[in-house]
Each structure stands twice: as structure tokens, then as C-alpha cells.
């Protein structure tokens, strides 16, 4: 999942079932953003709640936000609840978008063993209207196997894995809600269409 140079390396139905006869939407994964201080390859840690520091000799192979996008694409695509799940640069027409932001990714040394906290904010957007279909913040803390950057990398991978699992459920729930509203809107238009046809 993620690597460092030090280690080359609304609440909805929890089990959504979609009508396979209906058209599935296409989802575009927008490039994840990162909160101030976290949009960097430098690995952050803290020894007290009021001070953030960076490891001097350890860093991610790329920014966490950049490494996260392909993981989001593959994890959500595996749900089977979308016609396609594509990165931002795709030219294919899409109905929905996923916007995300890394709020926090840090190794915490205020207790033993140290812990890695990963917090991600995600929103599903209706591309036609620009409205937010669903929004949620995910956060996981995972204990490090060792109190060093390598232990932090392993813990970060586990935290990312947990959040991806929860995010796939969230995206499926949001899609189910969106599709229900689309069907409802289509049904609401039918009487007016029928009346117009009869009048003509």
C-alpha cells in the first residue's frame, strides 16, 4: 500500500443490494488532497499533542495523497456496484465523483507502543448537480510493531487497509441512495409526460 524509503518497499443500509437490471453509475476518483502539513513525502510524528515533527532520514516514496488514488480505484471497483471506477484523467462520462482528503497521517509516540493515526474525509458528488450525495470522515489508529519509522509504515498500511474497507461500504451505500433518488425523480415525471402525450 504505502511505503517509505526507509522500507523500500445520511446512515444507509449496511449491506446494499443493487438491482442488476438497472444501469450502474460510473464513478470518477478525484485526486486525493491533503490537509496542510500532510501534503509532503516527509513522515510526520509527534511526541506530545502540541508539537508535530518530521523524521530526518525517512520519507514516503511519494506523497501519501498521490499513492492513495490507485488504491481507492481498485478497492471501490472490486465492489461491483459501479459500471466503472476511473481516475480523474479518464475522458469517460461519469455520474458520480469521489472527493477525498487526508486529514491526518502521523505516528504518535505519546504512549507505548506508538500508534499511527490515519484520518480520511470522503464525499460522493453528483456530477450533474454538483450536490453532495454523502460525506463521512474515517479514522483508524493502529499500534506499531516497533517504535520507529519502519514500524510506522507497517501500521500505516494496516490503517489504510481498514479505511479502504469502510470506504467501499460507504461508497456502495451512497450509490444505492443516489440511484433510489434517481428512480424516484423519474417516476415523478411520468404523469406529466403521460398527460402531455394524451393532450397531443
Task: Describe the residue ranges of each PLM region.
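A structural "domain/chain start" motif
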Residues: 1-65, 174-200
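Surface-exposed short loop/turn segments
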Residues: 1-12, 79-129, 145, 197-199
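Soluble periplasmic/extracytoplasmic beta-strand elements of cell-envelope proteins
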Residues: 26-31, 44, 97-102, 117-123, ...
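Short secondary-structure boundary motifs at beta->alpha junctions and helix caps
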Residues: 52-59, 128-169
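Solvent-exposed amphipathic alpha-helical surface segments
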Residues: 79, 83, 167-170, 174, ...
Amino acid at each position: 500500500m504505502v511505503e517509505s524509503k526507509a522500507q523500500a518497499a445520511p446512515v444507509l443500509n449496511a449491506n446494499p443490494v443493487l438491482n442488476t437490471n438497472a444501469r450502474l453509475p460510473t464513478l470518477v476518483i478525484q485526486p486525493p488532497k491533503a490537509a496542510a502539513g500532510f501534503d509532503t513525502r516527509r513522515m510526520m510524528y509527534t511526541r506530545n499533542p502540541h508539537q508535530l515533527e518530521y523524521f530526518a532520514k525517512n520519507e514516503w516514496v511519494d506523497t501519501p495523497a498521490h499513492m492513495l488514488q490507485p488504491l481507492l480505484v481498485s478497492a471501490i471497483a472490486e465492489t461491483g456496484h459501479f459500471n466503472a471506477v476511473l481516475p480523474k484523467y479518464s475522458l469517460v462520462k461519469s455520474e458520480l465523483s469521489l472527493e477525498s482528503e487526508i486529514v491526518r497521517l502521523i505516528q504518535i509516540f505519546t504512549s507505548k507502543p506508538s500508534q499511527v493515526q490515519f484520518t480520511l474525509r470522503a464525499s460522493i458528488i453528483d456530477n450533474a448537480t454538483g450536490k453532495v450525495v454523502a460525506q463521512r470522515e474515517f479514522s483508524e489508529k493502529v499500534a506499531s510493531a516497533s517504535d520507529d519509522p519502519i514500524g510506522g509504515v507497517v501500521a500505516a498500511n494496516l490503517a489504510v487497509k481498514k479505511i479502504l474497507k469502510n470506504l467501499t461500504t460507504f461508497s456502495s451505500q451512497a450509490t444505492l441512495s443516489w440511484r433510489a433518488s434517481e428512480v424516484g425523480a423519474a417516476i415523478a415525471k411520468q404523469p406529466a409526460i403521460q398527460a402531455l402525450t394524451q393532450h397531443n
